[in-house]
């Protein structure tokens, strides 16, 4: 596996000026920050796809001016793969260290273990047990003794549910090492405000989008779940001049039959009269 494919660079992210969080979760994060000043701490963030789990981790790092390192756990297929790999270099086999060992030894680093329940092989997480335990250290023949630095906060995020292909149930022994917080979609009034500020749609357009989103979320038989991320995508498409139909068709990842069912449902429930017309034109350099 290539290093660049496993992780993103360490940096202090910019804060989102329109990031909203419920007071209960905010209170928990404040306590996590205090605990981290005494010793490293682990937090598991669970919730539906696209409800802002990764944004929460990024905003925590931004608010506290801490470096953030993100690791895609879904790319792991064997133990130790987070730490490095053997590679052929100038005709010799050498061990190439990845960013993870550096990140865990950086004081105050926020480490995001993204989709922790989706490794390619369950045993790929074995070496995390020691890192996330009270011991906070692991021995590797290639790197020696690695100790987690003071102030490090591990955030693990996961989508729970049978609808996520490749998702493994998180090992109870691993889960036991985390504080847990759950996230859900934003309330309508907050989601409406975020939609306006982040995408630039008008108040009327935001109201219309939220109405459509509520209708879809209240119709599980359609098999379409509209996340906050998707809501923002719909808003951006409309702000760029697209129609509601165009925005829905382009933003919802579903097959044509389901899409037609969704559009028909919206037409019946909300009285939407937009009609789709397909015309083919040349798409060539001018």
From Swiss-Prot:
A GO MF term: ATP hydrolysis activity
Membrane-spanning residues where?
A: none
Q: Where does ATP bind?
A: 47-54, 108-115
Keywords of the record, alphabetical order, are:
Aromatic hydrocarbons catabolism, ATP-binding, Chaperone, Nucleotide-binding
Q: Which GO terms describe its biological process?
A: catabolic process
Q: What induces it?
A: Induced by toluene.
Family statement drawn from the similarity comment of this UniProt entry: Belongs to the CbbQ/NirQ/NorQ/GpvN family.
The protein's role, per its UniProt record = May have a role in assembly and/or activation of benzylsuccinate synthase.
Stated name of the protein: Putative chaperone BssE
* Source organism per UniProt: Thauera aromatica
